[in-house]
Amino acid sequence: MTREGNSCCKAHEKISAPLATEQEYFDRYLRKTYSPDIFLEEALAFVDDAHAEQKPFFLYYPSPIPHVALQVPVEDLDAYPREWDEVPYLGGSYLPHPRPRAAYAAMITHLDKEVGAILDHLQSLGLSENTLVMFSSDNGTTWAGGVDHEFFGSTQGLSGLKGSVLEGGLRVPFIAQWPGKIKPGTVSEFPSYFPDLFPTLLAVAGQPDTRPHDGQNLVPVFQGQELLRKKDLYWEHGDQQALISGDWKLVRRRLGKKNPTTKLFHLVKDPGETNNLATEKPEVLERLLNISKNSRFPSLVFPNSGLDLP
C-alpha cells in the first residue's frame, strides 16, 4: 500500500481488449492521491519556510507530468473532446487508458495549473519582483505509453523523439521570467542547453565561477545582449553521440553495433536533419569529430559501448 491507501498496480500492464466502460479503467488504474499535487504542496511549503526565515532559496521543481503512464484527474480529462479518442490505449509499455489523447493534453493542462500556482504564490508573498523563474523540459516528446505525438504535431517537423540525439529529442522550450532583468516578450536565438544553468545560477547568486564545467552564463542573454557561443554543445546517450559547433551538428548513432552511422547537418538551413552533408563537407566533419573526441572522458560507470569498450 502507498500514500493514503493508494494500492499498487503493475506499471506496464496490458489488456487484451478494451474494458466495457471508462469507469472500469478509472476504478482499476486511478487512485485517490495524484502525486503531482503532492509535489506542488511540498514546493509551496518549501517557499513558505524560506520566506518565514527571510532566506534566499533555490527551488528545483521537477514535475512528473506530462509523462507516461497517462494518468490525470477525471475533471481535467473531461475538458477535452471525446471525439479525439476513438480507440483506447490497451497498455503494454505503460498502463492502459480509454482516452489517451485527452489524457496527455489534460496532463499538460494540469502542469500549467501547477506553474500558475507557484507564480501566484510568489506574488502573494511579495517575492515575484526578486525571483528568477525558469521553465523547461528534460527531453523531446515520447512515442511510448499511448502518446500520439503526430496528432499533436509535437516535433514540428524535427527528426527524432525522446531518447534520440536528433533535434526532436533534444530541442525543448525554455522560458524565463525575471522582473526588471528580462524584458517581457524577449526572444533569443542563442543556442543553449542544461549545462548552462550551473554558471547562470552562480552569476544570479553572486557566487564565483571557479570550477570547470561545460556551460556558459546566460545572464547576458536574459538581459538582451548579443552573445557568441564560446563552448560547443555535446551529448552522449546510449549508443549515440552528438555535437553542435556553430551552425553545424555531428550525429553518430549505433556506436559499437553493426552499421554505425555518422552524419553531418547544417542546422540553420536544415533543422529537420534531412540532408546529410558528411560526404560533401569532409573538412567540417573531421573538425567536429576531433572536437567530439576531445569533449569527453571515458566512463567506467556508464561506458559508451562504441567509444569506451574494446
Predicted regions and their residues:
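WW-domain-binding short linear motifs
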Residues: 231-234
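Active-site-proximal cap/lid insertion segments
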Residues: 1-195, 204-213, 252-259, 268-274, ...
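Basic phosphate/pyrophosphate-binding loop/patch that engages nucleotide-derived ligands
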Residues: 223-228
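Glycine-rich, aromatic-lined ligand/substrate-binding cores of catalytic
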Residues: 199
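Short hydrophobic beta-strand that contains or immediately precedes a catalytic carboxylate
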Residues: 264-265
